[in-house]
Amino acid sequence: MKTLSKLQQLSFIIRREFLAISTSYAVLLVLMGGIFVYGLLYNYMYAPNIVTDVPVAVVDNSHSELSRDFIRWLDATPQAEISSQAMDYHEAKEWMKEGKVQGILYLPHDFEERVFRGDEAVFSLYATTDAFLYFEALQGASSRVMLAINDKYRPDEAVFLPPQGLLAVAMAKPINVEGTALYNYTEGYGSYLIPAVMMIIIFQTLLMVIGMVTGEEYSSKGIRAYTPLGYGWGVAIRIVAGKTSVYCALYAIFAFFLLGLLPHFFSIPNIGNGLYIVLLLIPYLMATSFLGLAASRYFTDSEAPLLMIAFFSVGLIFLSGVSYPMELMPWYWKVVHYIFPAALGTLAFVKLNSMGASMADIRPEYITLWIQALIYFTISIWVYKKK
């Protein structure tokens, strides 16, 4: 009978949590908007992954052989297409405002003269940042052309070197460098960004939902509904376990949509073992849920979590080690990396999903996620015991 009573209490907590979520329009909006709209929007925005033939206007004030080579080689790159030549920068700027071009190449009058004098040549490339892929494409294309121009004219610059420098250049053996992308074979921005962002979306929206539900409980005194269950540690454990089971069940479905269906529809790298990803998501969702419940004592209303959590995405991408290598992080950022489940979970997921890693390859992240789950579980029990 005592066991049955505990199961009845757990069932009551689960039903009440589902009811709190399903009857709150704000929570449903975060779930529908954050998971489905946010997830679809990110994938749709970066669906091209890489862009080609970005229209560029040229302002050539040099009218030299070198400037013509630069323009011709830029046009030969797959990323850029020279659509027209403007009389001056103001005309090209108007074309950009009208949407006729996405970038402007400006070559000053002394472009060739500076090279032949042994100085650094200067050119300017303006690109729109309203679509980041255009900016990235033009930046990459211009960098490659600049290196090609440098290789072509470097022998002519030997006359500007001192004798010892000339001897060093003559004795140097050229090295041909060929780069091969091991995982992101298209070198597309979407292939690099989307897998990490999907994990961050799961973390952020889950914390928002927990914060909004517990904030509403605090402001409406809804926590008193658990008073008849008692005040012991066992009741606190059942409250935390019941709430967490609801969130994990919901986000198991959402994770399947974000990490399973969307990569298939938008051709995002998805070479990971499905079982390994499921094994990773278990401690990831549990640690995130326990973290939200542990922090619930600071959520005094349902609006505060939106303001506190919504702006963490860029920082979490950085902390994960995906956009910036862990080896180069200062020690204090490495400490923060091990505090948030999003950082560890995102790095582990990218290894599994985009790099085809095994569970042995993500062992440090996986073990740390379970440790986080245990620590935050203990803290959340203490928080609900105090409540």
Language-model features: locations:
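Extracytoplasmic/periplasmic domains immediately adjacent to an N-terminal transmembrane anchor
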Residues: 1-189
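Alpha-helical membrane-protein architecture signal
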Residues: 7, 11-15, 191, 232-245, ...
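Junction motif at the cytosolic side of a transmembrane helix
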Residues: 15, 21, 213-228, 368-387
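Loop-to-transmembrane-helix entry motif
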Residues: 17, 21-28, 201, 242-248, ...
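Hydrophobic alpha-helical transmembrane segments of multi-pass membrane transport proteins
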Residues: 40, 180-262
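Cytoplasmic juxtamembrane interface segments
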Residues: 119-137, 212, 292-314
